């Protein structure tokens, strides 16, 4: 199965943009406010932080599934 060039470029671009967003130190500008809000807010912020790296995988997987079905 041959992967179209645009699909390959799209997957790389989405992956890079996601990793750049995670590495940005300004990604969580309200870190001090979260710490002051209490343990519940810290638990929610931690859960969101753990789930965030999975979000860019959704369009990548969708595009790969579409490529497999069309090919």
Swiss-Prot record:
Modified residues (Serine amide): 70
GO molecular function per UniProt: sodium channel regulator activity; toxin activity
Keyword set, alphabetical order: Amidation, Ion channel impairing toxin, Neurotoxin, Secreted, Signal, Toxin, Voltage-gated sodium channel impairing toxin
Compartment(s) where it occurs, according to its Swiss-Prot or TrEMBL record: Secreted
UniProt note on tissues of expression: Expressed by the venom gland.
Domain of life: Eukaryota
Signal peptide: 1-23
Its job: Toxin that causes a rapid paralysis when intrathoracically injected into insects (blowflies). Does not cause spontaneous nocifensive behaviors by intraplantar injection in mice.
Similarity comment: family membership: Belongs to the formicidae venom clade 1 family.
Name of the protein in its database record: Myrmicitoxin(1)-Pm4a
Organism of provenance: Pogonomyrmex maricopa (Maricopa harvester ant)
């Amino acid at each position: 199965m041959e992967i179209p060039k645009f699909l390959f470029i799209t997957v790389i671009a989405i992956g890079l943009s996601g990793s750049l967003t995670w590495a940005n130190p300004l990604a969580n500008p309200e870190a001090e406010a979260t710490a002051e809000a209490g343990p519940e807010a810290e638990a929610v912020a931690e859960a969101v932080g753990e789930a965030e790296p999975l979000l860019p995988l959704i369009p990548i997987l969708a595009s790969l599934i579409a490529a497999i079905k069309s090919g």
